[in-house]
Amino acid sequence: MGYYALTEETAVQYVKEQGYFEKEATIVCREIGDGNLNYVFHLHDGKRGIIVKQALPYAKVVGESWPLSLNRATIESSALQIFAKYVPEFVPKVYGHDKELAVIVMEDLSSLTIVRKGFIEGEEYPLLSEHVGRFLGKVLFYTSDFGLNTEEKRVLDGKFINPDLCKITEDLVFTDPFGNYETNDYERELQSVIEELWCDKNLKLQVAQYKYKFLTRKEALIHGDLHTGSIFASSKETKIIDPEFATFGPLGFDLGQFIANLLLNALSREEKREVVFFHIEKTWSYFVDTFTKLWILEGVETYTKEKQWLPIVLQHIFRDAVGFAGCEVIRRTIGLAHVVDLDGIVEKDRRIQVKKQALYLGRSLLLHQTKGADIQVFKTLFQHIVSEGGIKV
């Protein structure tokens, strides 16, 4: 029959035909996707539920004028299965993948909430940073040259060639926000600050270097879009979803994206900033602890036995995370895909002020010449930006 876009009605028919439910079952189906690229259906029969996610042949946020390969569903399914090999507790179970329809059938996570939404509503998720830090520590180590022999890594890399979605990252994270491109989206009150960034040659030189790192450094399998909207959580559980941007890339990329989205939440949620900074600090400490233990116990690369090599690697990861965080903060403020943390601020004057702070924070992160791997740098730069008279760096 070939590819066709599912509806709530045809999704019910599909799951029955594929044997996920009995043909006589009464199934309730809702389209629940709020993302930019896919349809997501929640189906349940009163006893159990499943999720059906279907990739569209175009970017939903733009329309059919922006075509995309359906292979990203295969990328996502493959990434979830790789992640499950190392950290099954932190990803949803995959029940099936239909390549022709670009469909993934997976575990129902409706008992959990999206972290971005929960944070905005005042949730704290005490185990979030531990879980994300451990997830990244294991996945990045085991898919890097430090934990995977080079032949296997090259074969795995070949399975995650993801040109369409990598191009989105190249454009929307590293290029468009730093110039006058039509994909940008911002309030006119930000124009003078934005033009200041566009004219900052030192800033653009830094962005150029981070873009080049993303283009060329195939260090490990990265999620590629790890933000608070791609994580479900409760007070006890964390599940990382939506790795359709997965590819081999820099070790510090996912860390930077995740921390950037925490910073955006901190800008908008003054009363919970200490909770956010707790998570930033703990994410890094759990990542370092996990990565270090695996390096010592399971390192396969010859030079993992050299004691001075690990601190250099961790410093390299941290420096990259700081710069990638800067790009992401700016992108989420004025680029194509915003975050509700900022856009949801009702009072316009405050929203504009917070967005200005976000732009200056992003610039500060990019221009900061990190020495060592001091996680406090995020809090220090943040406090400077939001303090009186500290909006310019």
UniProtKB/Swiss-Prot annotation:
<dbReference type="GO" id="GO:0046522">
    <property type="term" value="F:S-methyl-5-thioribose kinase activity"/>
</dbReference>
<dbReference type="Pfam" id="PF01636">
    <property type="entry name" value="APH"/>
</dbReference>
<comment type="subunit">
    <text>Homodimer.</text>
</comment>
<keyword id="KW-0547">Nucleotide-binding</keyword>
<feature type="binding site">
    <location>
        <begin position="107"/>
        <end position="109"/>
    </location>
    <ligand>
        <name>ATP</name>
    </ligand>
</feature>
<dbReference type="GO" id="GO:0005524">
    <property type="term" value="F:ATP binding"/>
</dbReference>
<keyword id="KW-0808">Transferase</keyword>
<dbReference type="GO" id="GO:0019509">
    <property type="term" value="P:L-methionine salvage from methylthioadenosine"/>
</dbReference>
<feature type="binding site">
    <location>
        <position position="225"/>
    </location>
    <ligand>
        <name>substrate</name>
    </ligand>
</feature>
<dbReference type="InterPro" id="IPR011009">
    <property type="entry name" value="Kinase-like_dom_sf"/>
</dbReference>
<feature type="binding site">
    <location>
        <position position="331"/>
    </location>
    <ligand>
        <name>substrate</name>
    </ligand>
</feature>
<dbReference type="InterPro" id="IPR009212">
    <property type="entry name" value="Methylthioribose_kinase"/>
</dbReference>
<comment type="pathway">
    <text>Amino-acid biosynthesis; L-methionine biosynthesis via salvage pathway; S-methyl-5-thio-alpha-D-ribose 1-phosphate from S-methyl-5'-thioadenosine (hydrolase route): step 2/2.</text>
</comment>
<keyword id="KW-0067">ATP-binding</keyword>
<comment type="function">
    <text>Catalyzes the phosphorylation of methylthioribose into methylthioribose-1-phosphate.</text>
</comment>
<keyword id="KW-0418">Kinase</keyword>
<feature type="binding site">
    <location>
        <begin position="242"/>
        <end position="244"/>
    </location>
    <ligand>
        <name>ATP</name>
    </ligand>
</feature>
<protein>
    <recommendedName>
        <fullName>Methylthioribose kinase</fullName>
        <ecNumber>2.7.1.100</ecNumber>
    </recommendedName>
</protein>
<keyword id="KW-0028">Amino-acid biosynthesis</keyword>
<keyword id="KW-0486">Methionine biosynthesis</keyword>
<dbReference type="InterPro" id="IPR002575">
    <property type="entry name" value="Aminoglycoside_PTrfase"/>
</dbReference>
<comment type="similarity">
    <text>Belongs to the methylthioribose kinase family.</text>
</comment>
<feature type="binding site">
    <location>
        <position position="38"/>
    </location>
    <ligand>
        <name>ATP</name>
    </ligand>
</feature>
<feature type="binding site">
    <location>
        <position position="53"/>
    </location>
    <ligand>
        <name>ATP</name>
    </ligand>
</feature>
